[in-house]
Amino acid sequence: MYLSRTELDPARRSTMIALTSPQKFHGAVENSFSGERRRRLWRLDSLNGKLYLLLLSEELPDLTGLCAQFGTGAAPETRRYEPLLERVTSGSCWQFRLTANPTRARKDPADPLARGALKPCYLEAEQEQWLLEQAGKHGFALTEGAFQVTRKQTCHFRKNGKRPVTLLAVTYEGILQVTDPEAFREMLCQGIGRGKAYGLGLMTILHGGRSHG
């Protein structure tokens, strides 16, 4: 697998438009590959005052088009992902960042037997609880106080120019501890939660930190 980073130019009109419509970035990401369509994870990230698009993919991407459309002219960076995955061991602690779409099933009081419809978690307490629940499913542990919500954004756009879509994007940062390396590696590669086509679900990790509790 490959993890790529492309610096974006937020002053360009094309980038401004894409920042309000993730469908634009999704299309550019898909056009970076030839052949069969596969799941790719991507995310917008800010670091030291610069804006980047991170991309995790099975195949080596051709980022020429994406750079031409949204970039600053700086060459993109790409590296193999396997060396990081190999460092994931049971009990290891990592700093993490995740932008995800936390949702919860809400039952209809008029039909209590029906499966509840998935609705966004707008309350911060619910957003934190969602991540705590996801941790148990994906091979890592969190404790309250070891992570926080650092950003929230609601994005409205039309899918394929037709159906209206509303996505809640919540960014989490903190320290986690790996409890099941295999499940954790799978989550890193496959993503977490909904909205993956629109820049959600990619967790990035940096070795460091220590367990809380």
Regions found by a protein language model. Name each.
Residues M1-G213:
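RNA-interacting cores
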